[in-house]
Every structure is written in C-alpha cells, then in structure tokens.
Amino acid sequence: MRKRVAIGLLVLLAASLSAAAAADDLKGADAILCTAVQAMVCTEDGDCVVDNPWAFNIPQFLEVDLKAKKVSTTKASGEERSSPLRTVERDADVIYLQGLENGRAFSLVINESSGMLSAAVARDGKSVGVFGACTPMPSPMPTK
C-alpha cells in the first residue's frame, strides 16, 4: 500500500512539474501575467537598495495585454493602475515592451521560452530594476 501511495505521489509531482514548465512558454500568448520577484532602486548619488518589490510600491502582479498595448495591476490588487505601451515587439524569442508615462520611461524584456522577466523604470534621479517571471493568462470561459 505504501508503495502505491509513493508511486501516486511521484506521478502527481511529475505532472505538476511538467505543467509548471509548460506554463511559462509564452509563444503566441497575447495576455500574460507577470510577478515581480526582486527589485533594486538606485538614486543619482549612487545609493542602491535591494528589497522585495512591494517595499518599493511595485505591484506584485501585472497583467500584460499585448493586443491592447497596456500593462495593468490585477483586479484583486484593488490598485487600478494601468499604463499604455508605446512599443510591443517580438523578436528572436523575446518580447520587448516600452512605455512612457508621468515622467517615467519603462522597459520590460520577457523571454518567450522561459517566461523570465527583466524590467527597468527610469525617471529623473532614480532608476528601478525588477526581475520576475511571467506565464500566459488563461482564456476567459465562454459564456452560454
């Protein structure tokens, strides 16, 4: 009996690992959910601080809509923040996103195969770097 339970757990673990690995493939995805994992803020005097993204008021999750050319906080965050994207480009397995709003220039670079995210925001006297991961957002359920 113990052997069956162990085998069952291994099968479940293998299935969940393969699903997680497939979930990060962004090829063809137009709606992407990204999470910030680590952030660094630097000021013009050379001081830099590394901390959790939320310590710098960086949203934990961002929804990226490539068709609508916008990046937004999730509804669950209650923040209702959204920024337009001026540039949306896919090239050589990488998604490049750029925007400009409220005196800030921002860029996101997302690897389509791994879902890994590198982002930067710059404004006068301050820059922010963020590392994270992205996954395709599920399609909405069809209504009957």
Task: Please give the residue ranges for each predicted region.
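N-terminal signal peptide c-region/cleavage motif recognized by signal peptidases
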Residues: 15-19
